[in-house]
C-alpha cells in the first residue's frame, strides 16, 4: 500500500500539457458520467490531512484512455486521474509510472502538470489513481474558438506550437529530472518496429498484407542506431494540448 503526496508551487505556471480545461463542452453529460466512490476518496484524503471540497466532481469529456475528473482539494482545483474499468493491456494506464514522471518532469518542462497525490490502495477507488495539478484553458477538438475561427494562419500557428512543445520535451535530459532509469532505451526503435510488425500480422487477413510486409521490411532495414535517450509522448496530438485562455499559447 502506497500513498504519496507532493505540494504545488506557489507561483502560477504559464504553460502546461495536460488534458484538463474548463469551457463549454469540456465536461461529460451527467447521464454519461462514470461514477466514482467519492466518499471513499474523501476518507482516504482526510486520513492524510487533505480535504476534498464540497463541489460535485465533474468528469471531463474525451480522454477515455484514462478517466479524468475536476475535483477540489484544500480549496484548490485539481484533477483526479484513474484507469478505466475492466481488463487493461499489460503496461497500459500505469498510474504509478505516470506519477513518477510528472513528479519530476515539471522542474525542467513547465508544460507538464505537477503530480500532487498517488494511491495504489485498491479499496479506495478499485484501482490505483493520482491527483494532478489543474490547468485552465481551451482544448481544441473539432471546433475552433471564435477568436481563432476564420484566421488563415491558424493551422500554422497551432501546428508550430504542437511541434515546438514536443521538441521541448525531447530536449529534456532524463537524468536531469531523475528519470535516467525510466524504461529501456537500448533497442527501443527496433522493438517498436517489431511491435508494429506483430500488430500488422494480426490483421493481415483484412488488409493488403503484402504491402504491410514490404513496409515492415523497409523499416527494419533502416532502424537508426541507438542514441542518447530522450523522453517521448506516446499520444501527442492537438487535443492533448491546452491553450491559455488569454494568449492562446500552449499551457
Where are these regions (language model features)?
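Catalytic-loop of the protein kinase fold
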Residues: 231-233, 238
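ATP-binding pocket architecture of kinase catalytic cores
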Residues: 55-214, 222-228, 245
